[in-house]
Each structure stands twice: as structure tokens, then as C-alpha cells.
């Protein structure tokens, strides 16, 4: 088995691989051009790799290179292996492709991280743990805006008959509404803040980054250039928050009508995808985002946040903590650089804007 960069001549073999993978519902990009190609001056880009066995593609993965602020200095590291697929899930003779892809990725970039993954029950998470990666959950928070819609649709709770009956009882009485609102009554007053939805990130985002970055021990660079690459999609809501003449923070959000979502069912799901501010402004920035999504019709608002200050900001904005399957995994080399890990991890800034981005939201 040989793992090599994905080049134009391999596209027919990838199409054949995808055809064989149809029963598993998995696929690899059929274009060799990455979503984020290497461009001069850009500090965010991807490389694609494929596993070849006698000119047949048996798997593939991506590496996403980014500039990170790590302990008060900027370094290029990589996220991955992203989007890894292997024919081993259909044919046991290729079951080692996933391990070979991981080892190849570490040879190319020893300082690797992965976010998302889907929980410790996933095979990829078990592989990383066995390979001595440091793995932890990025905390998950939610705020219920419409208790009736929430209780009718929350599949995570309603999958058990007893809980389904309880949810229905709470929905049909005022107890559900009263209980949810009582649990979430922690909203701070807005200190003369102004929030606006903007089409793009400008120089004001650089000012926030330069002012706030020292409060983070591990965070992807979030200047205007990087944000314009990662957060330019038409679905995304980009909010700029100001107080007086000064911009104090920003938030990237989604507000998506869901159909058959595996956790939330058929609700309008508001998502706080990414954010940046200093510790003195985080609560106000989070409250502005929460108010906007509530006014925009969200039934439930969710966010994954790792930094202590953003977790406090969610709590004071009336969010509750729930179980998280959104994981952060650090390669042994990167974990070693971030010691003492338990102490520094409190100032990591990982959100749904990292890794593969806000998929499934």
C-alpha cells in the first residue's frame, strides 16, 4: 500500500473507489483540487492524499494546515486526518488502511489535532486513543427558546419510552415551560452594545484578534484574512458587536430549519459556531448573539466552547450544559508542547468553527 498526494491522474481511480463505497455511504472528493487550495500568502490550506494498491484507490484523507496561536507565538500545524475514508469498512483485507493513513499523516506533520469525531464510541476515536493521543470533549451547551417545540422533538430524550412520556406530559402542562425558563434565568443586561449582521470581516476583526489573542493558550489564528476564507459561506450569519465607537467582538452563527435531526428532530436550530472577544466582553457578545437568534425564530440554540470565559458567557446567557460528542484530540507531539495540559486546556479556544467546520448544523 502506498499513500501519495492526490493528483489529477488519480481522479478516475477515486471515482471507481466511490462507486465501490456506495453501500457504506462514504466517499472521497472526486476533484483533486482542495476546498482550501494552497495560495500565496494564505495561512489556511488543505492537502489531499490517497492510499493506492496496484493503481486502485483504497482510501484517502485530508490535512488542513492552519496558523495557530500557541503559548504566545504563531505556528503552522495541521488538522487531521480529516474526511478519512477506507475500503476496510467493506473489505477486511483493507482494514489497515485507516492505521496507515494516520501514520502517514503523522510523518507529514507530527503536530496534528482533530476535532469533532462523533464520540469515543467511534472507531477513529478508539484508534487515536490507542495511538496515545490526548482526547477530551469540547463542552456542549444549549438554550431552549420554545419549550413546547423542544419537548416535542428532542430525540435524545424521547428514544426511551419513559422519558418520551415525561416529555409529553411536561409539554402538555405548564411545568415544562416553567422548568425550562427557571433553569435558564441568568441573562445579563446589555451594556449599551450594538450588534449588526455584516457581509464580511474587515480590519476591525484584526483589532479584536490583536487585542484578545493573549488570553488564549491554543487557538487558530482568527484575523480578517483567515476569517474571510473560513467563514464566507452564504448560510453563515456574521455579527459584529460594538460598544460606543469600539468593536468588542464578533460571532458567526447559523439558524437552520432541521428535518429529522438525530438529536433535535424537526426544530429551528440556532448555532453559535464561532466567536472572538476579550474576557471583559465575552458575556455581552454572547448575549447579543443569543438575542439575535431568539428574535430570528430559533427554537433551540446550541454551542460547543472549550475556553473557560466562553463557557461562563454561555452560562450567564441562560445556557445549560449537555452531553458532548464533539471531541478534541491532540497528537503526542502537540500534547507534549501543551503541558501542563490540564492547566492550559482551560484557555484553549475550540468551537464548531474549527476542523471540518459547522457540518450537521
Language model regions located:
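Short amphipathic alpha-helix that is part of the acyltransferase structural core
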Residues: 1-52, 57, 80, 153-225, ...
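Conserved donor-binding loop and adjoining core beta-sheet/short helix segment
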Residues: 5-115, 138-145, 243-280, 321
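Active-site/acyl-donor-binding loops of N-acyltransferases
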Residues: 65, 112-181, 237, 243, ...
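Amphipathic coiled-coil/heptad-repeat helices and related helical stalk/stem segments
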Residues: 95-99, 223, 285-286
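Short, hydrophobic/aromatic alpha-helical segments in well-folded domains
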Residues: 101-102, 226, 288-289
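Oxyanion-binding "anion nests"
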Residues: 219-241
Amino acid at each position: 500500500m502506498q499513500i501519495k498526494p492526490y493528483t489529477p491522474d488519480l481522479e478516475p481511480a477515486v471515482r471507481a473507489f466511490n462507486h465501490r463505497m456506495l453501500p457504506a455511504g462514504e466517499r472521497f472528493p472526486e476533484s483533486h483540487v482542495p476546498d482550501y487550495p494552497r495560495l500565496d500568502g494564505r495561512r489556511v490550506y488543505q492537502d489531499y492524499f490517497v492510499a493506492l494498491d496496484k493503481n486502485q484507490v483504497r482510501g484517502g484523507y485530508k490535512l488542513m494546515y492552519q496558523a495557530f496561536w500557541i503559548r504566545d507565538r504563531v505556528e503552522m500545524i495541521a488538522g487531521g486526518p480529516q474526511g478519512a475514508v477506507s475500503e476496510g469498512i467493506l473489505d477486511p483485507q483493507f482494514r489497515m488502511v485507516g492505521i496507515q493513513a494516520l501514520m502517514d499523516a503523522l510523518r507529514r506533520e507530527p503536530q496534528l489535532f482533530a476535532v469533532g469525531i462523533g464520540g469515543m464510541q467511534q472507531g477513529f476515536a478508539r484508534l487515536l486513543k490507542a495511538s496515545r493521543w490526548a482526547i477530551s470533549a469540547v463542552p456542549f451547551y444549549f438554550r431552549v427558546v420554545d419549550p413546547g417545540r423542544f419537548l416535542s422533538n428532542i430525540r435524545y430524550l424521547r428514544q426511551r419510552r419513559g422519558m418520551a412520556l415525561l416529555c409529553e406530559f411536561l409539554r402538555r402542562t405548564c411545568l415544562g415551560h416553567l422548568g425550562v425558563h427557571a433553569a435558564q434565568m441568568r441573562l445579563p443586561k446589555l451594556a449599551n452594545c450594538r450588534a449588526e449582521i455584516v457581509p464580511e470581516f474587515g480590519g476591525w476583526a484584526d483589532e479584536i484578534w490583536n487585542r484578545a489573542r493573549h488570553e488564549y493558550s491554543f487557538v487558530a489564528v482568527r484575523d480578517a484574512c483567515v476569517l474571510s476564507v473560513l467563514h464566507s459561506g452564504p448560510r453563515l450569519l456574521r455579527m459584529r458587536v460594538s460598544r460606543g465607537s469600539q468593536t468588542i467582538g464578533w460571532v458567526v452563527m447559523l439558524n437552520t430549519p432541521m428535518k429529522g435531526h438525530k438529536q433535535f428532530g424537526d426544530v429551528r436550530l440556532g448555532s453559535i459556531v464561532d466567536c472572538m472577544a476579550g474576557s471583559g466582553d465575552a458575556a455581552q457578545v454572547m448575549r447579543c448573539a443569543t438575542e439575535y437568534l431568539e428574535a430570528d425564530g430559533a427554537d433551540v440554540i446550541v454551542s460547543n466552547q472549550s475556553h473557560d470565559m466562553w463557557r461562563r458567557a454561555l452560562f450567564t446567557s441562560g445556557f445549560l450544559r449537555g452531553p458532548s460528542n464533539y471531541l478534541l484530540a491532540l497528537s503526542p507531539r502537540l500534547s507534549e508542547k501543551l503541558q501542563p495540559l490540564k492547566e492550559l486546556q482551560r484557555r484553549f479556544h475550540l468551537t464548531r468553527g474549527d476542523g471540518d467546520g459547522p457540518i450537521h448544523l
